[in-house]
């Protein structure tokens, strides 16, 4: 049972009164990692993110991509999936709480298609009938073996697997 709460002052109410299992750590760690990766702030500011939720850390769901956010590899974020590796390390290894990997993130999905109602915005649509090319190639006609992925996509997927194995 996961909540998306944008007011950190309400986090504990959602956990203890609303009985949510997890809260997306959006306005804390996600926003801070994105700002650090863009050069808008120092990595030292990450400390305040985990300190502010230290007592409820096991209820925080870390993520770097989801249906609302721009893809790391998109032109609207980092422009290259490899630039997301430091964020992945921090997000996955800083604490013992869960880490969500979103639909093709580990393949470097760019979200740069102009599909359906959403247009070209660096996100992957969730509303339209659409084929996400990285997922289609990973599926490989139902074999789910990744044989059609590029070498770079395979390497990135292996990197994600190694990091997640450590977490």
Task: Give the role of each language-model region.
Residues 1-11, 24:
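Aromatic-lined carbohydrate-recognition surfaces of secreted/lumenal glycan-active proteins
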Residues 7, 31-34, 44-47, 54-66, ...:
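Loop/helix patches that line or flank the sugar-binding groove of alpha-linked glycan CAZymes
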Residues 11-14, 30-38:
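Short, charged, surface-exposed secondary-structure boundary motifs
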Residues 12-15, 112-114:
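A short acidic (Asp/Glu
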Residues 22-29, 46-48:
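A polyampholytic, Gly/Pro-enriched intrinsically disordered region
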